[in-house]
Regions:
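Residue-identity detector for glycine
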Residues: 2-3
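Short, Lys/Arg-enriched N-terminal segments with co-localized hydrophobic residues
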Residues: 6-18
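Structured secondary-structure scaffolds
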Residues: 20-67, 119-123, 169, 175-297
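A charged helix-plus-loop insertion that forms the helical arch/lid used to bind
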Residues: 79-92
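Aromatic/His-enriched, Gly/Pro-containing loop or helix-boundary segments
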Residues: 90-93, 108-122
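A glycine-rich helix N-cap at a beta->alpha junction
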Residues: 98-108
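Feature captures the FAD/FMN-dependent oxidoreductase FAD-binding
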Residues: 119-135
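Cys/His-rich short segments
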Residues: 136-189
Length: 297
């Protein structure tokens, strides 16, 4: 976890004190989902990240600014089928539009990761196998509610509390039963709670810290589904060909695979990791401040 700070992107914090120019600075945007063209919210978080990156560069700090695209999943597979193209062709076209927009806005990113990059795919497979071998991933069966647009699974009580719809987007959910691999989030919940309490600036603003603790961590975490068998557009689990890696391990790990973690050249990883700031939108705070830190533990 290190010293990473998660900033909900309507708040920007800049230090006025003189910076140590011998240090490095690593800042990221979320990686964006190419199911459609980007909108003002994507631009907002990216411009905010760009401003912070430029601030550090201007003060002589060696800076790495990462952005990218999260390209796998059932929604992409369905969209590509509707468009009459392959999933790869579908994302290639939309990601080209991402880069055109960042060029138009003069975004000064240092790295652009695509989760279809071969380096990323191999690193994710390595991570999945490592977690499986150490007993943190196990195979079971999932029965419950699934929202395709949000790529989120929900318990019965969560759907009931939301009035029968997805608690995040308000859209319809479907009941699914599927063999899956699960990650033992519950094993690390107490450790993450203590880390958040020991590091009060870990998540900002503070209202988001309270939300994560009161709504998710303190009531207790369920183990996390990390593979799917109902679609094929994803990174294959290399020791079980019926499964593809689900979004959590695939997308969230981009912050280290983009720096070369799991590859033959991890020089950028050794130089810049851990990240100093992850800029995220409010709808993905839970994934970045609970799932991602636990993955790193």
């Amino acid at each position: 976890v290190g010293g990473t700070l998660f900033l909900y992107f309507n708040l920007i914090y800049l230090e006025d004190t003189e910076m140590d120019q011998t240090k490095t600075f690593y800042i990221t945007t979320p990686i964006y989902y190419p199911s459609a063209s980007l909108h003002i919210g994507h631009a907002y978080s990216t411009v905010a990240t760009d401003a912070i990156a430029r601030y550090h560069r201007q003060r002589g700090v060696e800076t790495f600014f990462l952005t990218g695209s999260d390209e796998h999943g059932q929604k992409i597979e369905r969209k590509a089928k509707e468009a009459g193209v392959t999933p790869q062709e579908y994302v290639d076209k939309i990601v080209a539009g991402f880069k055109d927009l960042w060029k138009l806005l003069d975004i000064s990113y240092d790295g652009f990761i695509r989760t279809t990059d071969e380096q990323h795919i191999k690193a994710v497979q390595k991570m999945f196998k490592k977690l499986y071998d150490q007993g943190d991933i196990y195979k079971s069966k999932y029965t419950g509610h699934y929202c395709t647009p949000c790529e989120s699974f929900w318990l019965d009580r969560q759907i009931e509390e939301a009035g029968g719809v997805c608690p995040d987007c308000g859209g319809p959910v479907e009941l699914v039963e599927e063999e899956s691999y699960f990650f033992r989030l519950s094993k690390y919940a107490d450790r993450l709670i203590q880390h958040i309490k020991d590091n009060p600036t870990f998540i900002q603003p503070n209202s988001r810290t309270n939300e994560m603790l009161q709504n998710f961590l303190l009531p207790g975490l369920e183990d996390l589904c990390v593979s799917r068998t109902s679609f094929t557009w994803g990174i294959p689990v290399d020791f079980d060909g019926n499964h593809v890696v689900y979004v959590w391990l695939d997308a969230l790990s981009n912050y280290i695979t983009a720096l070369g973690w799991g590859s033959d050249d991890d020089s950028l990883y050794n130089k810049f990791w851990p990240a100093d700031v992850h800029i995220v939108g409010k709808e993905i705070v839970r994934f970045h401040t609970i799932i991602w830190p636990i993955m790193l533990m």
